[in-house]
Amino acid sequence: MEVREIPLPAATKLAADYITGAFPAESGFAYAQADDEAFCRRLAYLQGRTYDREGLADYLRAYHRRFSASVATMANIEKLRNERSVVIVGGQQAGLLTGPLYTIYKIITIIQLAKEQERKLGVPVVPLFWIAGEDHDIAEIDHVYVVEEGEVKKAAYPHKTNEKRMAADVLLDRMAAKEWIERVVKTYGETDVTNELLFFLSSCLDEARTFVDFFAAIVLRLFADHGLVVLNAGDAAVRPLERRFFAALIERHRDVTAAVLAQQEALRTLGYAPLIEIGRDAANLFYYDGRERSLLQYDEERGLFHNKAGTLVWTREELLELAETNPARLSNNVVTRPLMQEHLLPTLAFVAGPGEIAYWAELKEAFPLFDLEMPPVVPRLQATIVSRSLQTDLSDIGLEVADVLTGRLDEAKREWREATAQAPLASAFAKAKADIDAAHRPLRELGVAIDRGLEGLVAKNAAILQAQIEFLQHALERALLRKHETEWRKFWRIETSLRPNGALQERVWNVFYYINRYGFDFVEKLLAIRSPGNGMHKIVYM
């Protein structure tokens, strides 16, 4: 395995500028850089604060026992009782089979950074993955992408399409899930690893009742030796730990909204468009009745909290009572989730994708409202996997991986198509069209001379003749492409692997395609990638 680096700008302008150092970091973040000096300062800050470490460790120990978590994971949970311990945290939705590769890359970054900082700082550093089990948009996590019939297709797990419960509560039908897994893995092709892979996923499914369970079971096994800890943000059992902070969020909801709106305006003046959609009436919490999440708003005039439809209404006192007596009825939104994370966890650093980097900058002024400080924000690993056969294809057509990732492939395809299928026919068909037009012109003139009312008819007849010639030209072009199909399929393989549906590989393909091809030590190989946190895109040649 060989790893090279290329500069590849992030999709969001703010994240791209933050990674390269062009963004004025003090305008969006508490730490200008996520470097050793920042981690030392952050550690000193954390050691001046208190957390409910016993409650957190007790909850996590009980949760992980459900999944027969590894000795390393259980040991890391116990480390959290140590007043000096800290965590490296990052999170994502609970995608089926872990979703796109970027989720795995985020976990890898968390683990790498935790090991590095534990060695440098001399304190226990726990790698923790925050599973966004509160999310209710199941359509975002119910599928993976596969190649079928020569096309990149979405393979969705069959479930109720109008599902509105949190992912943590959406049950999996074991037989339907097993059949779906087999269908997905079949598209990967049979290898020496396939049976082991199917057994692995079946074993994870045995431990799972819900989408989140399945995700947790998979990542806890994949990273068992590295002591990964997970936190299911949609678990009702974690809500008692959040009760006090829910009350604080209710008390200061107007201040939170005002802080975000003001920060968004400040970023606009710097040329950065905001990502978070938030109105002045936002309460930044959801109410959850076990079936559906309702985003809460605040009616300033009446002094009442309510859902959008106005069918659920609370006074401030009633909502505070709910937070105290039944906190499982509340959950966080995009604004309050990072704040809750900081309340619960002694976070040394937050590992973020490009979108998260951009929207966290919008939250800068919300943290101080609760005497919190935004942690250092570390960009996750960004990578593209290149197989040996794909390296040959790239060499044959004269392209580098960087060319493909920066959009050069479409131009190369067009040039090849023109040279291979269009150029050899172009002059012959241009002459044929001109000759037919010349032969037809006297007939058009004769028709119009006989009856001017025939002008439209003769013009249409001429167009039909030209269209038939173009039809024949396209048919011959397709025949030439078939003749050169071996060469054409190189373009298809490159595009499908590196730029599927025009997106980055890490945003489409799933880790188990690569495990099926390279074995379970594929994940260990990724963990061995030295990731200096310089924001460069890693090209991993297998």
Curated annotation (Swiss-Prot):
Keyword Protein biosynthesis: no
EC number(s) recorded for this UniProt protein: 6.-.-.-
Coiled-coil region list: 458-487
Domain of life: Bacteria
GO terms assigned for molecular function: ligase activity
Keywords: Coiled coil, Ligase
Enzyme class, spelled out: ligase
One Pfam family named in its UniProt record: Rossmann-like_BshC
InterPro entries: Bacillithiol_biosynth_BshC (IPR011199), CC_BshC (IPR055399), Rossmann-like_BshC (IPR055398)
Protein family per UniProt: Belongs to the BshC family.
Protein's job: Involved in bacillithiol (BSH) biosynthesis. May catalyze the last step of the pathway, the addition of cysteine to glucosamine malate (GlcN-Mal) to generate BSH.
UniProt name for this protein: Putative cysteine ligase BshC
Phylogenetic classification of the source organism: Bacteria, Bacillati, Bacillota, Bacilli, Bacillales
